Amino acid sequence: MVQGAMPVEAERFAQRLENPREEQIGGWRFWHGTVDGYPVVVSETLKGMSNAAAATAIAATQFHPVAIINQGTAGGHDPALKVYDIVLGKYSVNLGAFKTPAKTLGEGSDSRQWQPMDLLASKGSAGEDKKAHSLRQFPADPNLLAIAQSVKSDYRQGKVVEGVIGSADVWNSELDRIRYFHDSYQTSIEEMETASAAQIAAEFKVPFFGIRVLSNNITNQGKYDPQTGLACQDYVYQVVKAYIANLKKH
C-alpha cells in the first residue's frame, strides 16, 4: 500500500496503476490496481494525524497489505536539505505529544521547556507516568529502507538521505522552535501523517516506511514548490517496483 494525504501526493501514483479501480470508504479514497502484475493499493489518507490513523486502520483490516509506504511532501528542519531532496525516514516521531511544566497565570509559555510524552509507555495516565518522558520512535522496516536505498541513484532532482520525520497537527514557522526540534530530536523534516500511520501499522504488525520530499525549507529560504509531490511519487514508484521484484524472488 502507498499512502498520500492530498490529491497532489496520491493521484499521480494511482494513475500509474495497471487496471485501476477506485473505491470510497467513508471519507477516504482508495485505488486498487497492479504494478508489474502485483496488487497495489493507493490510499488518499487526507491531511492530519487522525485521518492518517483512520486510513491506515481501514487499510490494515480491509486490504491486509504486506507493507505500507507513507509518502508525500514535508517542510524542512535541517538547513542542509534543499527543496526536492528526499528523506528516507529511519524513524518517525510524534511532535504533538508533550507535557508542559506547571506555571501560574502571567508566567507565560515556552514550548522549548515542554517535556516529550510517550502515550504508549503505559496504560495509565501519561501525564503522571515518570517513565513516559521520552519521544517514542517508530522505526522503518529495515527491508523497505534497504530497497529504497538501492534505487536512490535513479532520483535526479535532489539528493536522497536517511533522516527523522516529525509529525503533528501543527504547522511550525517559528525558527527557534524548528531548531529546537532539529537539535533535540534530530528531525530532518516535519509533516502531519507519518508517525500516526506508523503507530497504527505497528499495532497491526504491518511493515512500514515513510518517504518524504522537501516541498519547502524556511531554515534556508527554500520556497514552496507543489511539484515536489509528483517527484516523490515517481521515486516511490521505483521503490515499489524494486520491492515487488524482491517479493517475486522469494
Named regions from a protein language model:
Residues 1-57:
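N-terminal short beta-loop-beta anion/metal-coordinating cradle
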Residues 168-210, 218-219:
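A C-terminal functional module that forms or caps the active site or interfaces directly
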Residues 3-6, 49-52, 137-141, 190-191, ...:
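Solvent-exposed, acidic/flexible segments
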Residues 16, 143-155, 200, 235-246:
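Generic non-transmembrane alpha-helical segments
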Residues 218-250:
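His/Asp/Glu-rich mid-to-C-terminal helical/loop segments that flank catalytic regions of hydrolases
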Residues 78-182:
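Mid-sequence, gly/pro-rich, charge-dense loop/helix-turn segments that line enzyme active sites
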Residues 64-66:
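Proline-aspartate-enriched helix->loop->beta-strand connector
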